[in-house]
Amino acid sequence: MELEIADPAFRDRLSAPAYHVRQHNGCSYWNARLVRRDVPARYVGATHEYLSVDGPAERLDAIAFADHACGSSRKEKVERDLALLSAALAANPADARSMFYLAQTLRDAGRHAEARDGYAKRIEAGGWDEEVWYAMLMHARSCLALGDAVGFVDGCLSAYEFRPTRAEPLADLARYYRERGQNETAMLWVEAGRRIPYPEGDALFVDEGVYRHAFLAEAGIAGYYCKSPERRRAAHEATLELQLRRDVPDAVRGLARRNGMFYAPSADALFGAATRVPLALPMDEPYAPMNPSVMLDGDDLVAVIRGVNYRLGDPERSWPRLPAIRTRNHLARLERDGTAREAREIVPAPSIPPAAPSLVVGFEDLRLFRWRGRLHACATVRDRNPAMRCEIALLALDDDARIVELALLHGYRDDLHQKNWMPAVDGDELMFVYLCDPTIVLRYDPAARRVAVHREHAPALALDHLRGGSQLVRFDHGWLALTHEVAMIDEANRRYLHRFVFFDRDFRVSAITEPFRFADEPIEFAAGLAYDATRDAVLASYGVQDCRAMMATIDAAAVRRALVALPGSAGRPETARA
């Protein structure tokens, strides 16, 4: 048991004879915990004792107890409680509380038929309406455990009729019908349950998850299969909400993120028709283009296009058949239709130290930018240390696409594999957004050739699944970037989705779009972004299936409209400019 103190000054305001305090472990209930010394009180019950107070008691919201269920072993407790409660009922057969907890203990022991009968006896005994209602709900659940579907449905309906201010029976019905593929019926119970507010006045066994997230989670699954566009839209919105809620369990949030791949719109559906062009360069076999990074260099459109020697899904051209995974990069100046005016392979100048022997060779997924008058890129590299650990390399390029300076960016979490840092050129400073939740901004010190934490922010929503994608580019009053997230279909298959993320001037996440997809194929990765203010257009470059390099031109006004402000933030660009 852990005491949680929301208001440390609560002691100064204690004046009532006694106080009820909330205890919770996903299920919430209130019982007397603080009693003045002169107030008569006694413990009641053979087990699951509670403190009975003579006289009035108030609720104390300033503290609570988190129950981590760390008491005696479950088996020993069940056996002990069965003996104590059976003895109590033998002495007093009308003891309604002992009836209730005997049924509860039989349920915990997996003796569902006896539990069902025990709950029926407690219902018949009457008395405290909350305990009677809970016995009705548990009687229904015991029927379901015994395969009695009719008894379960009837029991849930009876429990709801008895206490329509409690939504737990409707959550059970929604799950029951959804698990049986009756999704339209499930949505009826979802819609009814969502209209029931949290029962603030109830003291016994309030399932907090039902009122916080259960109906949203059920809607996100069942609504996908409904015929009604309104229900499908509500299901999509429920899934988007759960993906970002901090106050739901990790498993619920994770399920919503996985389910998000089924709802994710195409970029065209979200932003209007985008112009797509391939960024194709002639590459020697066996290399194929992927994961380009575009930027606007003045009026010039410039891109780094990565070429790789492996092929997804081809065992003969994948690890471990290949002796090494190799990357070659080309710097290209492009027309707006994606054709290259000129292209040169990026190679180290003779002054750059040679790479170490490695099974993964070359600079991966460059992000291109201009800093201090020179083209630069940051990349992941594995062939600069004997352990083949992923490191971030900062590359300075000359006009002939030669790497004339190389710095490995150490100084923050050097013990981890590092990938996908997002560069931002802020005047004379070079920053990197390392994570979105918390938003960690690293500053590069060119004299020391190291990075250090410059800023750290905690966004209002859960954004821990957003991973680095493009550069950060100036956009309206802040910065715009593309991030990616991965939905795992199973252990071997995954789906990539992207979001536009808007940062304020101080690199706080201010607004995000919903996740979307550039392509209809599962593997896509955006590493480049540019904002063309003259045309008010966003240029996004991305790879598809690790074998195609693409660029999309998107209406910037549509991006602004799709960005949704985070609570407490400066807002989306359109709002801030108005």
Where are these regions (language model features)?
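"A position-specific structural signal for the A-helix of alpha-solenoid helical repeats
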Residues: 101, 138, 172-175, 179, ...
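Start-of-helix register in tetratricopeptide repeats
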Residues: 97, 130-134, 168, 209, ...
